Regions:
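Active-site helix/loop of acyl-thioester processing domains in fatty-acid/polyketide metabolism
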Residues: 52-72
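A generic structural signal for short beta-strands and their flanking turns/coil linkers
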Residues: 20, 30-32, 51, 75-81, ...
Length: 133
């Protein structure tokens, strides 16, 4: 497993467009949590966090979990992502908890639960598959 600083440096260099949006708040062998800093640009009418914001958080957080396990390979790509919106999220920061279920030779399968900060029930659940070489 690589260290948090390596992942942060990689993301800053390769994905400067997301700098400041996401923060790794927990980073250990079995437990990674990513905070999405929510601002007005992430809200939709009705004062709730938009679906595309939650989808992006699921994708980014699972990507970080993969990097933590296999290193900063640039040939890692999303091949599938399905998301279930379970509950209206509060207009606060979101926390994603990614989990790798299977790390195969060329595919990685897992899920991500997304929570409104300070609330224990998930607001969304995503299932993801990535391809890598």
């Amino acid at each position: 497993m690589i260290i948090r600083d390596e992942i942060n440096n990689f993301l800053e260099a390769e994905f400067p467009q997301i700098n400041g949006d996401y923060e790794i708040i927990n980073f250990s062998n079995e437990n990674i949590s990513i905070l999405n800093h929510i601002s007005q640009k992430h809200l939709r009418p009705g004062g709730t966090v938009s679906g595309p914001t939650m989808f992006a958080l699921a994708d980014v957080s699972f990507y970080i979990a993969i990097l933590a396990n296999i290193g900063t390979h640039r040939s890692v790509v999303t091949t599938n992502c399905n998301i279930d919106f379970l509950k209206k999220p509060s207009p606060v920061n979101l926390i994603a908890k990614p989990r790798i279920i299977k790390l195969g030779k060329s595919l990685i399968v897992g899920d991500v639960f997304i929570y409104s900060e300070g609330i224990n029930e998930p607001v969304a659940r995503a299932n993801l598959t990535y391809s890598y070489r």
